[in-house]
């Protein structure tokens, strides 16, 4: 098996399971790791989970698209979910999304304390205009990243 050193994280292989509904909670993350993934990424975690889009799948006549915007688990609930995910070993990357650099920094510090091995900044979301705008401006991405690091 091809071992990988990714940003100092020792992984048994280079397969990283991306954020999505299959990684919606600790059990899903743990199952992805048990299936052989080198690392897993949580669904995007936000500080306010009040918006709950349903249905989660949008069909346009040509195909279907997952339109679930982010995790419906409150930030404090991720302490338990990360413990479950990591109970079998493995690397868990927390994906976070926020409107301001300070909110990103808050989420990152919480998830680091909860046991996340790394943080992914989720700044591209075609369903949410404000985040789409963020993703198209390198200077804004720089400022958000600087606040988290």
Q: What is each PLM-predicted segment?
A:
Residues 3-11, 16-22, 26-149:
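Active-site entrance/lid segments in N-terminal catalytic domains of soluble metabolic enzymes
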């Amino acid at each position: 098996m091809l071992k990988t050193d990714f940003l100092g994280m020792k992984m048994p292989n280079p397969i990283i399971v991306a954020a999505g509904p299959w990684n919606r909670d600790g059990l899903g993350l743990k199952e992805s790791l048990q299936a052989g993934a080198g690392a897993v990424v949580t669904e995007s975690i936000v500080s306010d989970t009040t918006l709950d889009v349903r249905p989660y799948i949008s069909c346009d006549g040509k195909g279907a698209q997952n339109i679930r915007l982010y995790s419906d688990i409150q930030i404090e609930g991720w302490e338990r979910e990360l413990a479950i995910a990591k109970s079998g070993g493995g690397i868990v990357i927390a994906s976070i999304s926020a409107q301001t650099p300070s909110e990103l920094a808050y989420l990152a510090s919480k998830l680091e304390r909860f046991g996340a091995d790394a943080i992914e900044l989720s700044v591209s979301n075609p369903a949410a205009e404000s985040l789409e705008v963020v993703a198209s401006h390198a200077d804004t991405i720089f400022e958000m990243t600087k606040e988290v690091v």
